[in-house]
């Protein structure tokens, strides 16, 4: 409706000499002067505009389905449709009296007006008042309300129904949600199976499942009887442990050493914070002179030990007067070892390399490839 008003204002502010009113069209028909806006074009456009006006005011009420309202509709709803229809009729009638040569009406323009009027009618209707269901006692699910006898003042909620409900569902006519109808077969399958107490009664005359005669007359073998016998299990926790673990007489009469007694004593708890440090630290170096003397003392030999020879023996005169030869003196000299880079010449070339003659293949491989210059 806003676009139609703007278009009419632009036409009034900028008059076009070629625009003709309805009276001028009739006068032109009597005089026999036919223009571009003659009787066929003008009458067709006027009829189309009137037909569009009639459809605009009638079709939205027929096509739009009535929505079910949860509460009472506002009193202003019925008063809004009248002014809207009057405004639309005035706009279309005033536009029908004009004939524009530059811009002719089309089917898309009529459809746009129809959609806009339908949208205005949809926006004019008030929203559903959900607060009317606030104090209702019940649970709403998929178009049905389950009346709860215990809970009150429940908020309106939508959720999937439980398949374990066996109470009767009451149809809720206040909901505006379209849901599929549940068949009787689906309701029957959704209910849980009944607990038949007579099946498990001790005084029943017939068993739950009938046992065939061949099963009753069957004779079990010895192996089946052996496997069917339950195993005898001993409770190891009820046995006295003194009967299980027998201590030998030698262990009972054993005398522990001082080392064993010292290790058997529990360690005293740490008193300093440094002793609780889990990271081990190196011990300070302390030399024990007495311990060193003890280690330096040779071990005493047993009296029954007879050595091969006396630890003290005399040196022979021949050994004392011996003269070392030049070979022994040379072998007695330590080997002189050079440093890593001592006496090393990195530019030394062997004489064989100086005399060598290169073959044509070596010359070919030694020739560098041509390098193209970058432009």
From Swiss-Prot:
GO CC annotations on file: cytoplasm; nucleus
Residue spans of biased composition, Acidic residues class: 59-75
Keywords annotated in UniProt: Developmental protein, Differentiation, Nucleus, Phosphoprotein, Repeat, Spermatogenesis
Highest taxon in the source lineage: Eukaryota
Stored InterPro entries: SPMAP2-like, THEG
Location of region: Disordered: 1-78
Distribution of this protein across tissues and organs: Testis specific (at protein level). Specifically expressed in spermatids; Sertoli cells maintain the level of expression in spermatids. If isolated spermatids are cultivated for 16 hours alone, the expression of THEG is down-regulated. May require signals from Sertoli cells to initiate changes in its gene expression through spermatogenesis.
Keyword Translocase set for record: no
Signal peptide span: none
Miscellaneous information on this protein: 'Kisimo' is a Japanese word for goddess of easy delivery.
Function per UniProt: May be involved (but not essential) in spermatogenesis.
Subunit structure: Interacts with CCT5.
Record's protein name: Sperm microtubule associated protein 2
Lineage of the organism: Eukaryota, Metazoa, Chordata, Craniata, Vertebrata
């Amino acid at each position: 409706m806003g676009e139609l008003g703007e278009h009419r204002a632009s036409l009034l502010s900028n008059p076009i000499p070629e625009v003709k009113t309805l009276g001028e069209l009739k006068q032109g028909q009597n005089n026999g002067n036919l223009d571009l806006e003659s009787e066929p074009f003008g009458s067709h456009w006027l009829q189309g505009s009137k037909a569009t006006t009639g459809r605009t005011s009638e079709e939205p009420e027929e096509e739009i389905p009535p929505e079910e309202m949860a509460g009472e509709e506002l009193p202003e709803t019925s008063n809004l449709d009248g002014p809207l229809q009057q405004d639309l009729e005035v706009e279309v009638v005033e536009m029908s009296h004009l004939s524009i040569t530059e811009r002719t009406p089309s089917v898309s323009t009529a459809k746009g007006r129809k959609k806009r009027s339908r949208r205005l009618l949809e926006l004019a209707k008030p929203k559903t008042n959900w607060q009317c269901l606030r104090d209702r006692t019940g649970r709403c699910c998929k178009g049905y309300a389950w009346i709860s006898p215990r809970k009150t003042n429940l908020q309106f909620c939508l959720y999937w129904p439980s398949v374990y409900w066996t109470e009767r569902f009451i149809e809720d006519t206040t909901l505006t949600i379209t849901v599929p109808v549940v068949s009787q077969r689906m309701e029957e399958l959704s209910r849980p199976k009944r607990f038949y107490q007579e099946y498990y009664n001790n005084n029943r005359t017939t068993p739950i499942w009938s046992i065939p005669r061949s099963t009753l007359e069957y004779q079990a073998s010895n192996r089946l009887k052996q496997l069917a016998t339950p195993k005898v299990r001993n409770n190891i926790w009820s046995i006295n442990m003194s009967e299980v673990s027998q201590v030998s007489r030698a262990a009972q009469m054993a005398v522990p050493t001082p080392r064993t007694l010292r290790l058997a004593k529990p360690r005293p708890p740490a008193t300093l914070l440094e002793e609780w440090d889990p990271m081990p630290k190196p011990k300070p170096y302390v030399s024990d002179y007495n311990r060193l003397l003890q280690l330096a003392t040779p071990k005493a030999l047993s009296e029954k030990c007879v050595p091969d020879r006396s630890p003290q023996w005399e040196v022979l005169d021949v050994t004392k007067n011996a003269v070392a030869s030049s070979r022994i003196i040379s072998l007695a000299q330590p080997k002189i070892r050079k440093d890593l880079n001592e006496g090393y010449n990195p530019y030394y070339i062997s004489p064989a390399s100086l005399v060598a003659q290169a073959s044509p293949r070596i010359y070919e491989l030694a020739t560098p490839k041509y390098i193209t210059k970058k432009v």
